Amino acid sequence: MKKIISKVSWIGLSVLILAGILFFAVKTGCKIATGVDDDKRFFTAMITDGGGINDQSFQQSSWEGMKKFSKDTNSRVSYVECPQTSDFLINIDKLADEHTDLIWGIGYKLADTIELAAKTNPELNYAIADFSFGDKTPENVTGVIFRSEESSFLVGYIAALMTKTNSVGFVGGIKGMVIDQFEYGYRAGVAYGAKQIGKNIDVKVQYAESFTDSAKGKAIAIKMFDDCDIIFHAAG
């Protein structure tokens, strides 16, 4: 039986972390949801890095976490969908003008914009998911990163034990630091499982160079299924 294994664990984890960490802490080409201007409750907003809040993936899980936080704490939450990178800075600036208490950037593509905004507005608080500035993190920024290689290792290990063709696949979105973690963990898990059961298992890897082109991802998977019976994707 052919199987596609997706990054469900990452999506679920993002909901829990986003909902928990919030306790500590417009319009050109974009869609914005706003609260009431005179509402004095704690106000948190998120901005997407190109995807929408209905992407059935990272952005949607983040927004679900925001809504849960709002329900649990009676705070205000909002979002801005920005399909173009050129929209990032202008809309983060608009959120700053709205006196947002905490501004979230969802995705590593927003790193430069978050860093610039944080330095420009030191009195505001910012956070970014899936990125860390390391030792250069501004004092008013929190970076949230995931140990994606660990969950991917488990997926690879299971794939090694389940494969009947001794060939499994990995489909990535855009190659880079974030998706490299998924590929590395998956390959390591397959290798560990293969060694344990005494098999040679091939791992085929291909990138779509997109997080939104589902047709290309499907085409890659269909071709990969000529040899593979299990595919793991980290592609949005």
Label the predicted regions.
Residues K2-G12, F23-G236:
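A residue-level marker of the well-folded mature domains of exported/periplasmic proteins
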Residues A19-I21:
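Hydrophobic core of alpha-helical transmembrane segments in multi-pass integral membrane proteins
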